[in-house]
């Protein structure tokens, strides 16, 4: 691409300036405090209902102390990839404990959750293979599929009939991989895993579940979607992240030992990326210990989720088919979604706007996410303010 063509392409990207000119830009908002149920923005108190810290562990003093201890012992970074000089004993310890949690033989760490999908999908599948994706799968799954050069086929969201129909048309001798979110990050619903494993068995397809938003939320001890349904043995690969329930940064993939060994020596996002920092690993280890040994965190998360969902539904909000602490509040208009987000922040409530192309414009929404550490009073305050702002915006469900 010539320099002129690149400049021309960039010149057409004007949505940011349009939103800023209207005072509606809602991204890259700088937070001046710890990621808690209340944060400071522009020196003002704001209720945080946009965080993925489902268990509220990012401010747990035990986790902070574990990170500080790791900094003192190992330093700030590993200065290399896992493949070469960047493997610490605590990396291996964390992999072992994650394998135990999700019920798989082995696991491999990645430096980010995004890389945890990018590496495995791109190296396990090839040009003559087929990858089947839910149309609402995460961007990292889509990008990993593109990098594999496989033939990518999307099926309707959580539509098992469509998945079966798409698989039925593929050559029986070809390699096939189904990749799905466990809990979908925008809609908050859970994959129909029982039906999916039947279809995967029927068509000899491998199955990978992205548990980024499921780990610490569902399943025994927070082990995720496969555990939630009692189908661990039927899922070939389980992916998870540490930036949500586990209060850190990074990710992993777990599966059979031979598959994980293959990934260690072929997944580029392991071989050519610096490994997780010592502080991140230690934080994850301590958060994992707390998640398993203190079930009250998950219990509180679900108490808050059920309470907030009840309050929102009784107030007339459209929540779609959510089954999780991710409560999508549908507005179904891009500009109104930005307006509501801005007005809520001005009124002391932080939520995340989700608009096209992340979702179709007629399904635009704000994502209202619960934490175990929210109080009912905080939820009540947020709902009261949302009712007022939605009525000002003339959102149809609340008029």
Curated annotation (Swiss-Prot):
List the record's Gene Ontology CC terms alphabetically.
cytoplasm; membrane
InterPro entries linked to this entry: Aminotrans_II_pyridoxalP_BS, Aminotransferase_I/II_large, AON_synthase_class-II, PyrdxlP-dep_Trfase, PyrdxlP-dep_Trfase_major, PyrdxlP-dep_Trfase_small
**Activity at various pH:** Optimum pH is 7.0 to 8.0.
Q: What class of enzyme is it?
A: transferase
Q: What is its EC number?
A: 2.3.1.50
The entry's pyridoxal 5'-phosphate-binding residues are 113-114, 213, 241, 243
Needed co-factor(s):
pyridoxal 5'-phosphate
Q: Which GO terms describe its molecular function?
A: pyridoxal phosphate binding; serine C-palmitoyltransferase activity
Q: Where in the cell is it found?
A: Cytoplasm
Q: Kindly give the PROSITE patterns that the UniProt entry links to this protein.
A: AA_TRANSFER_CLASS_2
The UniProt entry lists the main location of this chain as cytoplasm
Q: Matching CDD domains, A to Z?
A: KBL_like (cd06454)
SUPFAM superfamilies in the cross-refs: PLP-dependent transferases
Task: From the UniProt record, list the reaction(s) this protein catalyses.
Answer: L-serine + hexadecanoyl-CoA + H(+) = 3-oxosphinganine + CO2 + CoA
Task: Give the UniProt keywords, A-Z.
Answer: Acyltransferase, Cytoplasm, Lipid metabolism, Pyridoxal phosphate, Transferase
Residues bearing PTM N6-(pyridoxal phosphate)lysine? 244
Q: What family, per the record?
A: Belongs to the class-II pyridoxal-phosphate-dependent aminotransferase family.
This protein's assembly is summarised as: Homodimer.
Could you tell me what this protein is called?
Serine palmitoyltransferase
Q: Which gene encodes it?
A: spt
């Amino acid at each position: 691409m010539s320099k002129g063509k690149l400049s021309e392409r960039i010149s057409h990207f004007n949505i940011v300036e349009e939103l800023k000119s209207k005072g509606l830009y809602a991204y890259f908002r700088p937070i001046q405090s710890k990621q808690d149920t209340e944060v400071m923005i522009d020196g003002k108190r704001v209720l945080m209902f946009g965080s993925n810290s489902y268990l509220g562990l990012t401010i747990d003093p035990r986790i902070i102390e574990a990170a500080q201890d790791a900094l003192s012992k190992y330093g700030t970074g590993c200065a290399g990839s896992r493949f070469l000089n960047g493997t610490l004993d605590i990396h291996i310890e964390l992999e072992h404990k994650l394998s135990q949690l999700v019920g798989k033989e082995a696991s491999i760490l990645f430096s980010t959750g995004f890389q945890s999908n990018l590496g495995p999908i791109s190296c396990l599948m090839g040009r003559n293979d087929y990858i089947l994706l839910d149309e609402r799968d995460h961007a990292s799954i889509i990008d990993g599929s593109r990098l594999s050069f496989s033939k990518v086929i999307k099926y309707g969201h959580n539509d098992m009939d469509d998945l079966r129909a798409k698989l039925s048309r593929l050559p029986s001798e070809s390699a096939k991989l189904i990749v799905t979110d466990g809990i979908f990050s925008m809609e908050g619903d859970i994959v129909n895993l029982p039906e999916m494993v039947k279809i995967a068995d029927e068509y000899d397809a491998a199955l990978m579940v992205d548990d980024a938003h499921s780990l610490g939320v569902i399943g025994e001890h927070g082990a995720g979607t496969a555990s939630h349904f009692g189908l661990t043995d039927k899922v070939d690969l389980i992916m998870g992240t540490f930036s949500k329930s586990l209060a850190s940064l990074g990710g992993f993939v777990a599966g059979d030992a031979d598959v994980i060994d293959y990934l260690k020596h072929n997944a580029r996002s392991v071989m050519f990326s610096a490994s997780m920092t010592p502080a991140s690993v230690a934080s994850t280890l301590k958060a994992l210990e707390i998640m398993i040994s203190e079930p009250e965190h998950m219990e509180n998360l679900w108490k808050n989720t059920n309470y907030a969902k009840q309050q929102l539904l009784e107030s007339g909000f459209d929540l779609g088919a959510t089954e999780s602490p991710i409560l999508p509040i549908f507005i179904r208009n891009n500009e109104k979604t930005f307006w509501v987000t801005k007005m809520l922040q001005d009124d002391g409530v932080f939520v995340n706007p989700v608009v096209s192309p992340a979702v179709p414009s007629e399904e635009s929404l704000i994502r209202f996410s619960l934490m175990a550490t929210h109080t009912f009073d905080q939820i009540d305050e947020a709902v009261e303010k949302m009712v007022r702002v939605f009525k000002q915006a003339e959102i149809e469900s609340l008029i």
